[in-house]
C-alpha cells in the first residue's frame, strides 16, 4: 500500500474512532415533567376555539375542554339542555385517542353562553358532590 493510501486509511480510522467515542457517551435526554401533557397547550383545561367570534357574539360559544371525555361532556349537555336560555348545546370527541372534547353552546340573544356554561358546571359539581356524599354515607354504614 502506498504512503498516500496509508494516510487515508489512518485518517478514516481516526475519524471512526472519534465517532465511536462520541456515540458511546451517554446522550442527554430532555427532562419532561411527569405532569406535562403534550396534548394540552400551556396546561390549559379549557380554551375558547374562536375568541374573536365569541367577543362579537357572546351567545355562541365553542370551547375545547382538555383532559375530558364523555363523562363530563354528556353531564354538561344534559344540564344545559334543560335550561330555558339555551337554544342549542352539544359536544364532540374529535378522535378517540385525543384527550379532549369540543363543546358548543348557543343561547338566546343577549344571554352570555359562557355564564350559562358556568352555571351548568356548578350544577354538575353539586350533583357529583351529592352522589359522593351518599356513596360515602352508604359505605360507612356498610362497614359498621
Curated annotation (Swiss-Prot):
GO BP annotations of the record are:
transcription by RNA polymerase III; transcription elongation by RNA polymerase I
Molecular function (GO) terms for this protein are:
DNA binding; DNA-directed RNA polymerase activity; protein dimerization activity
Q: Where is the composition biased (Acidic residues)?
A: 18-38
Q: Where is this region: Disordered?
A: 14-47
Gene Ontology CC entries for this record: RNA polymerase I complex; RNA polymerase III complex
Q: Where in the cell is it found?
A: Nucleus
What is the recorded name of this protein? Probable DNA-directed RNA polymerases I and III subunit RPAC2
The gene designation is rpac-19
